[in-house]
Curated annotation (Swiss-Prot):
GO terms for molecular function: ATP binding; heat shock protein binding; unfolded protein binding; zinc ion binding. Zn(2+) 1 binds at residues 148, 151, 205, 208. It comes from the Bacteria. One of its GO terms (cellular component) is cytoplasm. Binds 2 Zn(2+) ions per monomer. Pfam families: DnaJ, DnaJ_C, DnaJ_CXXCXGXG. Disulfide bonds: none annotated. This is Chaperone protein DnaJ. It is found in: Cytoplasm. Participates actively in the response to hyperosmotic and heat shock by preventing the aggregation of stress-denatured proteins and by disaggregating proteins, also in an autonomous, DnaK-independent fashion. Unfolded proteins bind initially to DnaJ; upon interaction with the DnaJ-bound protein, DnaK hydrolyzes its bound ATP, resulting in the formation of a stable complex. GrpE releases ADP from DnaK; ATP binding to DnaK triggers the release of the substrate protein, thus completing the reaction cycle. The keyword Cytoplasm applies.
């Protein structure tokens, strides 16, 4: 099945900026995160979204993808590789090896005994709203493959060692020679008996079964920076799986899921909340206490405040994860209309309305009421 276009997965155009790509990724990753979305295909969609973002957020990978798509430009035609054949017998034609190298990728066979970096690992961590805002230090356990302590990674039983493969004589390749009218062609393929290593294990280590690696749970101490947000990830260098043949270890990527808060909402480094006001507080003004992540602060409400009015508490938001100060807290007031009134309260409100006279019918509200009256009277 053909892979979907990365731009299509994130729902952005091919000219999208890095900020637009990041915004689309954050929105979709929240929607399809397996901890939130319980649909059967949510995990697969989340994986697809993450893969698309990892490519499009990296300038080099994105340029490569824009040029070649999902195809590997080194693959050549139908998996044919020039290194599978020896064109030494074409000396009279001059440069045949270079010609085939040009057309079919020209890659040399990778040495299976060469050092290779270990695999990267991913770990998903759930944080509370406050933990994400202020950061924390914690220990986590991750399952990973590690070098076998019994054989020290050789795969051979202690006291024994790997032996030279008798089928390929240590070359890691098996060659078949074919004569043609144009000369001699030697076909080389990876030795199926030793897997191209040129060696085989006669007596395997009983602990790892000859693989040289065992499954373990590794405890890692992690320092989570203050200001981390939902969907962001933290790279812990060198804590992935160990390298092969002396290669460097991979990295550990911790992806964070932040639980929603019952009172606050977050947008970047800013925090939003709603505060209820009584009719009297809004009309007469008041000084109220507002909860923030940093404790309660006093907020002065001016007389005549309307529902939906927004106040800003500077520096009371979330610390920037890169250390660039703090965001702000935005307080939106909502004037609460009472629904259950006693007879005395109703009478007082009627008296208040009568005492108000024409005050509600002056200014912009007055023009609105005049239009309503004219509409009911049929005036234009």
């Amino acid at each position: 099945m053909a892979k979907r276009d990365y731009y299509e997965i994130l729902g952005v155009s091919k000219n999208a900026t890095k900020e637009e790509i990041k915004k689309a990724y954050r929105k979709l990753s929240k929607k399809y995160h397996p901890d939130i979305n319980k649909e059967p295909d949510a995990a697969e969609k989340f994986k697809e979204i993450k893969e698309a973002y990892e490519v499009l957020s990296d300038d080099q990978k994105r340029a490569h993808y824009d040029q070649f798509g999902h195809a590997d430009p080194n693959q050549g035609f139908g998996g044919f590789r020039s290194d599978d054949f020896d064109f030494g017998g074409f000396s009279g034609f001059g440069g045949f090896e270079d010609i085939f190298s040009t057309f079919f990728g020209g890659g040399r066979r990778r040495d299976p005994n060469a050092p290779r970096a270990g695999a990267d690992l991913q770990y998903t961590m759930t944080l509370t709203f406050e933990e994400a805002a202020f950061g924390k230090e914690t220990d986590i356990e991750i399952p990973r493959e590690e070098t076998c302590d019994t054989c020290h990674g050789t795969g051979a039983k202690p006291g024994t060692k790997k032996e030279t493969c008798s089928y390929c004589h240590g070359t890691g390749q098996i060659s078949t020679e074919q004569s043609t009218p144009f000369g001699r062609i030697v076909n080389r393929r990876t030795c199926p008996y030793c897997g191209g290593t040129g060696q085989y294990i006669k007596e395997k280590c009983t602990t790892c079964g000859g693989t040289g690696r065992v499954k373990k749970r590794k405890k890692i101490h992690v320092k989570i920076p203050a200001g981390i947000d939902d969907g962001q990830q933290l790279r812990v260098a060198g804590q992935g799986e160990p390298g092969i043949n002396g290669g460097p270890p991979g990295d550990l990527y911790i992806v964070f899921h932040v639980e929603p808060h019952e009172f606050f909402e977050r947008d970047g480094d800013d925090i939003y909340c709603e505060i209820p006001l009584t009719f009297a507080q809004a009309a007469l003004g008041d000084e109220i206490e507002v909860p923030t992540l940093h404790g309660k602060v006093k907020l002065k409400i001016p007389a005549g405040t309307q529902t939906g009015t927004k106040f800003r508490l500077k520096g009371k938001g979330v610390p920037n994860v890169r250390g660039y100060g703090y965001g702000d807290q935005h307080v939106i007031v909502r004037v609460v209309t009472p629904t259950k009134l006693t007879e005395k309260q109703k009478q007082l409100l009627r008296e208040f309305d009568q005492l108000g006279g024409s005050s509600m019918h002056q200014g912009p509200y007055g023009r609105f009421f005049d239009k309503v009256k004219k509409a009911f009277k049929g005036e234009s």
